[in-house]
Design a protein with these regions (language model features):
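Extreme N-terminal starter segment of soluble prokaryotic enzymes
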Residues: 9-14
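Short N-terminal binding/cap micro-motifs at the start of the first secondary-structure element
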Residues: 21-28
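Short, surface-exposed acidic-centric catalytic microdomains
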Residues: 31-72
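Short amphipathic alpha-helices and their capping/turn segments at secondary-structure boundaries
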Residues: 2-4, 32-45, 85-100
Length: 153
């Protein structure tokens, strides 16, 4: 739901916290994106990290989707944590009437269209992360940091 700021119409955008500069990625780093940060000048940005919101620590073992489960490189099934984080992100998106989301590409949580194949070898396959799947089911448009030219602004 667009909001007003003076004469400007502002979009409400859910954004992966790592893209905003938060050190929440699995290895404890970020992937700050200045172009996304600039969107905060004229839009409402709501940061999320589904992995942390689901109860996972930072740093943490990398995880990949294997069949319908999310498995860490140590062999631990972390599907429940990923689902809990996705549901929390969805709650925030719906509560704030988000117009769309910008989520981290290739992540098992936030990846859209392309994710790692579950072998922990760096190979990628077509697919969506857990949060993206849930957002799509609830008709929340999702973009990655590689699709900023497609944003409906």
């Amino acid at each position: 739901m667009h909001t007003q700021k003076g004469s400007l119409t502002m979009a409400v955008i859910i954004v992966s916290n790592c893209l905003l500069g938060c050190t929440c990625r699995y290895k404890g780093d970020d992937c700050r994106n200045e172009q996304i940060l600039k969107l905060a000048e004229n839009n409402t940005i709501i940061g999320v990290c589904p992995e942390q919101m689901g109860g996972l620590s930072t740093p943490r073992d990398p995880s990949e989707i294997v069949d319908d489960k999310v498995i860490s490189s140590a062999g631990r099934d972390v599907t429940a944590e990923y689902m809990r984080g996705a549901e929390t992100a969805l709650f925030l998106a719906e509560l704030n009437h988000a117009d769309f989301a910008i989520l981290k590409a290739k992540s098992p949580s936030c990846g859209k269209g392309l994710i790692y194949d579950g072998t922990f070898t760096g190979n990628k396959i077509p697919g969506d992360g857990v949060t993206v799947q849930l957002f799509k089911k609830h008709n929340i448009p999702v973009f990655t940091e590689d699709e900023l030219d497609l944003l409906p602004l």
